[in-house]
Amino acid sequence: PEGNFDKIYQETGYNTSDFYRRLWWPEMLNNGEKYNVKYTGLIIESYGDQVKGPFKPLDNGAARNSLIAYGRELLKAGGELGIHGYNHQSLAPAGYGQDKLGYATWESQADMEESLRELKRYIEDVYPGYEIHAYVPPSNILSPEGKAAVKNVFTDIKVYSSLWEGLATAKEYFQNFQLNSDGTSEIPRASSGYAPSQEEIWEAYNVLNYNGVFSHFVHPDEIFYEESENLTWAIMKQGMTDLLSELQNRFGWLEPVTATEAYEKLQDYVQMDYSLTRSKEGIKINASNFQKPLTFILRTDKEIGSVTGGSAKRIQANAYVLTMTDGDFEIKWAGEE
């Protein structure tokens, strides 16, 4: 974002672009390093409402320079670049509730694909040869035509990431964690915002306890939203610090991953086979059909003496994280070795 926003200027003394460069982005990078978080950043070329071609290249050198600067720093920090769209007009025809959001509607899948081809050109010009694997739909609205358009233009796409849950009457795109027959996947975001409510955090922890995933989303421009009217930058900054600090304290065993790395984890989660054998001496796990190290949570009152085929890390008085690097994994209890 550019220009001046009174709310930001009055609190920080910075214009909008300097606020993001000098305060917001350093805070994001610091949080990533301090709390062991990886980011997947989503690219958008225009905030216009055009839904009919021709889609002209963005005539904004400052925006292009920002994509270069922020993108390179994101990649350097171990992150990943994905896409949000040519613009913020959800890829859907009429009937998906866009009128309530003030969005334009697309007449055809061909128009959607034409806009995405311009986005692809825009990215290729800045990051030649970079493969795009992740897509997040604007306002969490995505039609079958829009989904097909993304896949047709960005043929390396692996992850569609929208919402985990919501109202049954909503027109948003809700997902479960799954692999699709075309080689793509559904990896929803379970929570969002810089200062989520306790209810939202509780819902995110429910997902985490369900399948071991914490997936959170923030908009850089959230401070501009009507819903953020009573939120200052200081409140939002502290809210994110509190969220990540609590996450690290409670679930410090979580492994940070980008969208593509999450896709690889999901592949193993769905496709791997394993068997478990218990004995007085310990536990044996035999697994197959996996590419990356597997992670299990083991709850036991017993003390682990030795491990072969991987590692074990105590995370609570009666719980361990098991990391399996070999198809044959064995634990022996202390005193039974």
Place the predicted regions along the sequence by residue.
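Catalytic grooves of carbohydrate-active enzymes
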Residues: 1, 32, 125-126, 132-134, ...
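The substrate-binding groove and active-site-proximal loops of carbohydrate-active enzymes
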Residues: 2-21, 51-62, 101-110, 131-138, ...
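C-terminal beta-strand-rich structural cap/linker in extracellular carbohydrate-active enzymes
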Residues: 316-337
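Short, well-ordered beta-strand segments enriched in hydrophobic/aromatic residues
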Residues: 276-290
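Alpha-helical scaffolding within the catalytic cores
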Residues: 62-72, 167-175, 195-205
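Surface-exposed beta-strand/loop patches in extracellular or lumenal glycoproteins
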Residues: 286-303, 331
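His/Asp/Glu-enriched short active-site or ligand-binding loop at hydrolase and phosphoryl-transfer sites
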Residues: 151-195, 257-258
